[in-house]
Amino acid sequence: DLMNDLMSLGIHRIWKEQFLDWMAPRETHHLLDLAGGTGDIGLNFLKRGGGITTIADLNFKMLSTGQKKITNKKFNQRLNWINCNGEKLPFNDEEFDLVSISFGLRNVTEKDVALGEIYRVLKKGGRFMCLEFSKVNISSLSVLYRFWSNNVIPFLGEKVSGNRKNYEYLIESIK
């Protein structure tokens, strides 16, 4: 979470708020948040009045970290944490009103398979929402973005988390 703030200068929080606005959570909605990590999207979905959230991630450690940060115990009844692969979802057909993935689709090996699984588990009329990085098309910003991405983010990764390579991979995965 700290690294997300540092890497994006806090802008990721604005993106996520807008993402949740577009979701328009309702009490009757069941959300599947893929690559849900520590639960930022899923927990905020509940705080905004969503019904049930299932947070799914391949990384068990991220899910465990997310479970520890829950301060509102009433959410436990409406929250599921599932360690699974987005390319082979362990859910019934047409189970979810919404499926979201934020900053995770670029890490999926077989995107077409994962998108097929998302379609399978979405209810008819359900919505898939994806928040992801993309190329910067404004040339003046592009120069700054490349400098920040190639120099500052790996440096921050090394100083804050002790792992420069993970953040070099992150930048490559965005390209």
Give a label for each model feature.
Residues D57-F60, E110, F133:
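Short beta->alpha hinge that forms the Motif I/post-I loop of the SAM-binding pocket
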Residues E87-V99:
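A short acidic, Gly/Pro-enriched loop at the edge of an enzyme's catalytic core
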Residues D97-E110:
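A short SAM/SAH-binding and catalytic strip from SAM-dependent methyltransferases
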Residues D1-L9:
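Class I SAM-dependent methyltransferase Rossmann-like catalytic core
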Residues L58, K135-K175:
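C-terminal alpha-helical "lid/dimerization" subdomain adjacent to the S-adenosyl-L-methionine
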Residues H30-K88:
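Class I SAM-dependent methyltransferase SAM/SAH-binding core
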Residues L9-H29:
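Conserved alpha-helix/loop element of class I SAM-dependent methyltransferases that forms part
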Residues D112-R127:
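A short glycine-rich, Lys/Arg-flanked "PGG" loop and its adjoining helix->strand segment in the class I
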